């Protein structure tokens, strides 16, 4: 079995600053409609947005797209219950790259603290 791991950590204040500066433009550029809806229904959406941002960055690091390949972050979606197992759903170029590289599955771990959010993505193939 071959695995590829990506991780990311972000200060929640960075995402808060981006949201305050760019508003909906930032949200619509980075998050899918379902992710925006999920996060907006949380008491404090910032840690949830930050965590999802980390998942997207961690996936990009794990997939190693190569030079001059830009992946649309909205095509990397995180689904799952608040305290349950999370699932990564890929679309477009992200899904195509995942399949082309022969990956058969992935695991996601996401965590939030007061000031930071972090995520690890593990891609694997038999």
From Swiss-Prot:
Keyword hit for Metal-binding: yes
EC id: 2.7.8.7
GO molecular function, a single term: holo-[acyl-carrier-protein] synthase activity
Entry's Gene Ontology BP terms: fatty acid biosynthetic process
Reactions it catalyzes: apo-[ACP] + CoA = holo-[ACP] + adenosine 3',5'-bisphosphate + H(+)
Thylakoid among keywords: no
Annotated compartments: Cytoplasm
Pfam families xrefs: ACPS
InterPro entries for the chain: 4-PPantetheinyl_Trfase_dom, 4-PPantetheinyl_Trfase_dom_sf, ACPS, Ppantetheine-prot_Trfase_dom
Family: Belongs to the P-Pant transferase superfamily. AcpS family.
Role according to the record: Transfers the 4'-phosphopantetheine moiety from coenzyme A to a Ser of acyl-carrier-protein.
Protein name: Holo-[acyl-carrier-protein] synthase
């Amino acid at each position: 079995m071959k695995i590829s791991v990506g991780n990311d950590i972000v200060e929640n204040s960075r995402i808060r600053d981006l949201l305050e500066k760019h508003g909906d433009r930032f949200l619509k550029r980075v998050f899918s409609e379902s992710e925006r809806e999920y996060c907006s229904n949380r008491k404090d959406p910032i840690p949830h947005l930050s965590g999802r941002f980390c998942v997207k960055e961690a996936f990009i690091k794990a997939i190693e797209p190569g030079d001059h390949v830009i992946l649309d972050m909205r095509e990397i979606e995180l689904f799952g219950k608040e305290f349950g197992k999370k699932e990564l759903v890929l679309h477009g170029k992200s899904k195509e790259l995942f399949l082309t590289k022969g990956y058969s599955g992935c695991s996601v771990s996401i965590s939030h603290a007061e000031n930071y959010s972090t995520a690890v993505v593990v891609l694997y193939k038999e």
